[in-house]
Amino acid sequence: MDITVNSQSNTVAPKQAECKKMRYSIRKVATVGATSALVGTLAFLGATQVKADQVTETAPAVATATATPETSTASLTVASETATSVATSEAVESSVAHSEVATKPVTETQPSNTTPSVVEEKASSTVVTSSSDATTPSATVAAVSAPAHTSEAAVEAPTSTASSEAADTHTEVDLKVSENSAANANLSKLNGRIKSIVEENMTSDQIVALTEEEIKALNKVDFSDDAIKGTGTSLTYRNLKDIVASFLKQDSKLAVPYFKADTIINMPAFNTVDAQTMKKEEIDVWDSWPVQDAKSGVVSNWNGYQLVISMAGAPNKNSNHIYLLYRKYGDNDFTHWKNAGPIFGYNALEDDQQWSGSATVNSDGSIQLYYTKNDTSGGKLNWQQLASATLNLAVENDEVVIKSVENDHILFGGDNYHYQSYPKFMSTFDDDHNHDGNPDRTDNYCLRDPHIIEDNGSRYLIFESNTGDENYQGEKQIYKWSNYGGDDAFNLKSFLNIVNNKHLYNLASWANGSIGILKLDDNEKNPSVAELYTPLVTSHMVTDEVERPSVVKMGGKYYLFTASRINKSTDAEGTVAAREAVGDDVVMLGFVSDSLRGKYRPLNGSGVVLTASVPADWRTSTYSYYAVPVEGSSDTLLVTSYMTNRGGIAGAENKSTWAPSFLIKMNADDTTEVLPKMTNQGDWIWDKSSESLVHVGDQNSAKLPNEDFNVDYYAVSGYGLKPHTYPTVDGSTGVSEAHGVLTVTVKDGKDKKADKPETPVSPTEGNHSVDDKTNKPGTSKPADNNQPSADKEDKPTNPTNPDSPARTPFPYYGDHSNDNNSSNDHHVAVPVKPSTGDSVGDRRPVAQAAEIATPVPKTIVATGPTVPTNTVKEESVTETEAPKPVKSEEKVQSHGVDKANEVTKSDESSKGNNTKVAAKLATTPKTPSDSEGSNSNILSILATIFAAIASLALLGYGLVTGKIHLPKK
């Protein structure tokens, strides 16, 4: 039964029109006192029934109980009795599941310090009732809209004296039914298999919190067979997370060995005349490859010499051209390498670049070169094409010389079905995949790095590429369940994370990296494409870049390797974690198959074979890993690389150079391990004389005295180029506002860049769009400190490029390029790790796999019913727990943030809005606990005292003024 009390009724005697003087009798005064006493009594009783958790500045009295399936919300609220009521808001405890705030009802069985979550409720004029038995307390309350000046209140009184146990049971059942109804309402909107997946892997609260947009996205999931046409082997999102987890462990079986920094020297053979600048100076050398036997892959013995072709160029000059190096076969002395000069001659053009490739010996002794021709003329965004040329060499006076270059021609530029072409790439470059009204311009075009291999009498090229129409990029890739690669729980959480984050959604929709394969015809010296095939490996939704692929045939198996960077992937959290743990994020990936075009299996489960060990700006930082078979071995490979990032990253005097090589072993179970075997710098052949201990180091000796753990990623990974369009970062929290991932900030300390400002870095700083021509590592462009050598500028008599019209340089350059536009540096501090001794294999794990690859929580069996609240849906579901910030004083915001605090802040910032009231109505009478009873008892006692004082005051006033006359006997 509802009891409504009018505070003005029976308190003022009716005016008598015929009386000139108002008189009060003792009977009427008594009535006033009785009424006041009744008000105080009701206030006392109400204090045991109604407890205000939060009261805002409102005049109208509202008591609501709402259950709205459309908003997936069931909440109980009650307002203060009048505008003059005062109550103290209690602390709010919130439990977040998926991304909603869950609220539990308070019953007698719950401890007094348990309080519900608070949500904002709009005033409603709809009356929502929940009928109950006559033997149980009524749960019916009305939602009333009233003007701000109204002082009426609707308060429910107890209607039964049933036991509290029965009330608890009834309440829990009602709330559980309400909760299940809301969850079932959302489940009913899902179709087929995705409905079962959601039901099995999400809690009721999470299901209730699903938005209409999420439900719509879930219904678009494509469960097509994993063996999708045009896919090849998929590098999945699960693989990516596992790669990062392995990276963080710094497992000695996978981590690149430490090299002793003070033993590393610049390559003497590259103190030479630069093909483009025409100045003699020490120049950088990076991607390199030997002339190999196309059948076995071993380094060819060409007339007693080993030959290597390298990309090289003057620092900070955007000089990207290839040179021929040679040394006596079997010689292990790094200083004995000699430079035959640029293959395509001097006076080279900045816009006509040559990038990575491979080479083999033809039957007539000539060298067949396969390389990447890159055109940046007229503002082109790195138009890469596969090319080939024949090198005619000779030995003259113990020197290898380039006599001529012939048959230089384009082999392949993309067919648009198997492999994306540059025109097709440009046709969608301005598309808006994340639907924000602006062109994305984050796509990355790759068609480069051809690697020659001969199998069953035919020559094939393996190359880096992007997929074509056969299995093209686009939003559809986000909805392909097979691209996620994990169990349903992992896939579901990852899917919701991506669809709720427009930036990840953007990158994932464009990512369509692939490792392609084509067959050449039988013309060795002037080949053309005979046949195209579906890619061997694809990385839809994961990355656009899988660089420098190569296939090694060994032990009856085919091993496929590629180099990559985590920061070029869609795992922003993984990039941050890797950079914070190590200071770099480069890896070598590997796959194995029983045939050249067979199904490739990822090595070590995820595909990771090598992980970086030192910060990217150290002298001993390595990249561009290239595996060469060891002659006579069926399970061992020699890994080569270049060392020191270009453009003076480790100091202007430290040029990019060839690193010492080391061995890795392929195990029968498709696992790999780094062996404690190292060579001198620049060794491409492993034999009995190859092993050297000169460069063996540990973590302490792997850096130069002036090197520390502050990494300038803008210079190292950005090379002066613009990053992908990522959300802005809150400098006070270090958190990306779009997806709440932790950014790594500067650590206080002295270093060679200590004079530069501390600036938070985006978790994906260094992820670059093709708009910025980012395809391979480059550098930022400081002032050029490299002066021409005073030595005589001897110019070898090598062929020069054909005449070409002058071209206006384009301001953006690719990763392959050596341009270094000046920029503001961003330093990221990497925690100093303790020395692990001088053993290459002795490493301490930096982080656990679970920290980077967290599965979706399984369905939780609730110990009590919960009432989902109507709260703002979080923007995304974070896949990983963000790493701790370097600065302890910085606040970190995670996806588990208490949304109740946000509501409270919102209330504080919107005072004066008298329509928002949030409180909770207990459903059974109970004695107030110590925490809540004191306030309610005080209020009721004060109300009673006030009523008594008011009665006495009126009586005294009437007697003194003569307005009240005591009756005479």
Curated annotation (Swiss-Prot):
CDD domains reported in the protein's UniProt record: GH68
GO annotation, cellular component aspect: cell surface; plasma membrane
Regions of compositional bias (Basic and acidic residues) in chain numbering: 747-758, 872-910
GO MF, any single term: levansucrase activity
Biased composition regions of type Low complexity, renumbered to the chain: 89-103, 124-166
Reactions this protein catalyses: [6)-beta-D-fructofuranosyl-(2->](n) alpha-D-glucopyranoside + sucrose = [6)-beta-D-fructofuranosyl-(2->](n+1) alpha-D-glucopyranoside + D-glucose
Domain of life from the UniProt record: Bacteria
Annotated sucrose binding sites: 286-287, 356, 448-449, 545, 565
EC numbers for this chain: 2.4.1.10
Catalytic residues, chain numbering: 287 (nucleophile), 547 (proton donor/acceptor)
UniProt KW keywords: Calcium, Carbohydrate metabolism, Cell membrane, Glycosyltransferase, Membrane, Metal-binding, Signal, Transferase, Transmembrane, Transmembrane helix
Residue numbers spanned by region Disordered: 89-169, 746-843, 860-934
Keyword Calcium: yes
Regions crossing the membrane: 938-958
Main function: Catalyzes the synthesis of levan, a fructose polymer, by transferring the fructosyl moiety from sucrose to a growing acceptor molecule. Also displays sucrose hydrolase activity.
Record-given protein name: Levansucrase
Organism annotation: Streptococcus salivarius
